[in-house]
């Protein structure tokens, strides 16, 4: 994975840099593995009221159906055919042809190339891209696409460059260190994929212009200090005025820095040994 820097051919390419991958194949997605998606309201609820600010517009996308379960293809050898970009996520995806004739998309593990083979199941070897139950994975192994509930499919460590680490096993539970720094308990029967998610340098990209953000469906963010007093706690005043508060606040008057926003007494609290950093 490398980062491609653009020359200043136009103002839009000034300071522009994107992640590039020589092994990626520019191909149309599999038609049977794509579906249209209705992006409901772009941050609005069923009444048309904004519930999430700074969203709207964006390019139309086809949703790629990713196989996060991997359990339906136990002990069936699969071959990596293509490595493609997915506009719906930061990670690359791989098209896999299985020996039984079925084709699926999976997240691209770092280091996997076209022509490599993958396998799922309890007896799969500990190699890049293989999916196994946590009880069969050695301690210290880096993993991604980790299930939280058995059979539900991977939900943790799925973004570009994400990686979790198996650090302990005790009874029917295993202890994982997640990308956020959180340490939590997961059932030993949950599946995980060996290795790190590819496209590691995605976080180093520079979009360079406002239009690139609009293509992603992200609208401008207006600072509260330049609003009117009726619109934000930081607003109002003559000219460039300070916020007039002891500490920054959200548009709804809550503390903006350091206040915990996690729901109290959540069912998963018993599984978290150490909160994220």
UniProtKB/Swiss-Prot annotation:
Keywords from the UniProt entry: Chloroplast, Plastid, Ribonucleoprotein, Ribosomal protein
Plastid recorded as keyword: yes
Record has Plastid as a keyword: yes
Bias (Polar residues) ranges: 1-11
Question: What SUPFAM superfamilies does the entry give?
Answer: Nucleic acid-binding proteins (SSF50249), Translation proteins SH3-like domain (SSF50104)
Q: Name one GO cellular component term.
A: chloroplast
- The lineage's top-level taxon is Eukaryota
For region Disordered, the annotated ranges are 1-47, 254-277
Tell me where in or outside the cell this protein is found: Plastid, Chloroplast
Gene Ontology biological process: mitochondrial translation
Q: List the disulfide bonds.
A: none
Entry's Gene Ontology molecular function annotations: rRNA binding; structural constituent of ribosome; transferase activity
Q: How does it assemble?
A: Part of the 50S ribosomal subunit.
Q: Which family does it belong to?
A: Belongs to the universal ribosomal protein uL2 family.
- Protein's name according to its UniProt entry: Large ribosomal subunit protein uL2c
The lineage, from the top, is: Eukaryota, Viridiplantae, Streptophyta, Embryophyta, Tracheophyta
């Amino acid at each position: 994975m490398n980062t491609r820097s653009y020359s200043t051919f136009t103002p839009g390419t000034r300071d522009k840099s994107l992640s590039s991958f020589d092994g990626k194949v520019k191909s149309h997605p599999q038609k049977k593995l794509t579906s249209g998606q209705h992006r409901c309201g772009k941050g609005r609820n069923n009444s048309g009221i904004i519930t999430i600010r700074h969203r709207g517009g964006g390019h139309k996308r086809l949703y790629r159906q990713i196989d996060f379960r991997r359990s339906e293809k136990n002990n069936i050898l699969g071959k990596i055919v293509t490595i493609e970009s997915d506009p719906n996520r930061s990670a690359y995806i791989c098209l896999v042809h299985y020996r039984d004739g079925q084709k699926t998309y999976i997240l691209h593990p770092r280091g996997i190339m076209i022509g490599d083979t993958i396998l799922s199941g309890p007896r799969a070897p500990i190699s890049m891209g293989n999916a196994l139950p946590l009880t069969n994975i050695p301690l210290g192994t880096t993993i991604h696409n980790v299930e939280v509930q058995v059979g539900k499919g991977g939900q943790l460590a799925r973004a570009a460059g994400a990686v979790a680490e198996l650090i302990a096993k005790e009874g029917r539970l295993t202890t994982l260190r997640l990308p956020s720094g959180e340490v939590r308990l997961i059932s030993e029967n949950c599946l995980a994929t060996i290795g790190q998610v590819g496209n590691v340098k995605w976080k180093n990209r520079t979009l360079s212009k406002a239009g690139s953000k609009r293509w992603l469906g992200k609208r401008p963010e207006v600072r509260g200090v330049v609003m009117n007093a009726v619109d934000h706690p930081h607003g109002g005043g003559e000219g460039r005025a300070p916020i007039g508060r002891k500490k920054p606040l959200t548009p709804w008057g809550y503390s903006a820095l350091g206040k915990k926003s996690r729901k109290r007494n959540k069912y998963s609290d018993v599984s978290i040994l150490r909160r994220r950093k």
